[in-house]
């Protein structure tokens, strides 16, 4: 059994009932085989893959809080500090009923490579809780966030671990979390990113993941003889990433014809109206049925189906494993030339393989959606220097970072004999930086 297979078998054995974590580790290790085989004896002696796939620290705790009826509620919470080899732990806090330790570990593992790809000094981590902010009053959300931070604050800090927003954790939640951290520590520091502009946040942070996705997609298309202008784009999701991916795609001359939420999806052949979408989702916090009701060219469909429409580029921006094998087949049949992941691991391994086998350009999430964490790191820089950059300054830095990410993953894929395999290129480029740092720092 090869070293890679031994490590994967150990991960499965020691982390039962964590399929998302298994999937993430399998995908990374498989694409690293060419790298590992060049130095297998050294990596085995140093147990480098074992240390890379095992979090440095896993923090599990309960979060008791009181609802509006006076009933005490208790939620499970997690913070997985995966790797600090290249900087303080960095990764979001997810608030969703589906959250469990396996999902947080998968996200933290992916985050390590994504953060490495940015070229910025940030390690990998992730956290969250099975608390659902949907349907809760502001007071209930505040009560949860304050209780959550009362335990979490012991393990984080501007130079230790810097959490951020994620699914379910927006500006409101970050504000409550930051307020409680400041209250407990009496320190005003850049311990969270995604903060409001009035207390240390960065311009362009809200737009960053969606904009960055399009900047990398644009670079990938250009390197393969295509341009984004004039392309028809299918986007899934209707949250932060999807909204600003739609906005930037249209600014670059593409036409986006779909968006989706948890109940259904919209097909709008005239092109998605970004202003209306933002009003429905960000202001009214309503379902997409209201978008369809307000726009004559739009048709609402219940259930899944975003990837059945004819498109040149597909951007899955909703959640993990949303783009399945049958979706990949539909995309290929409809002439799709490129897929770039806006969400974390939204494409199943079977779908990824099918797309690549059929010549579809494929940009994995750890590269394509790194714009969010890159801009979080830029927020950390501004906090450290007590500065605030303009929107255009941050956007220009983001565009350069995304162009560099594509250049690095493209070069890594070519160096190891896999030109055009951006999944392998992203994993290899991310791995090499982390591995070099781990070796330099000794057995820690």
What do the PLM-derived regions correspond to, one by one?
Residues 193-196, 201-310:
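Glycine-rich phosphate/diphosphate-binding loop of Rossmann-like nucleotide-binding domains
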Residues 264-362, 367:
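Rossmann-like adenosine-cofactor binding region
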Residues 2-24, 220, 332-444:
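Adenosine-phosphate binding glycine-rich loop
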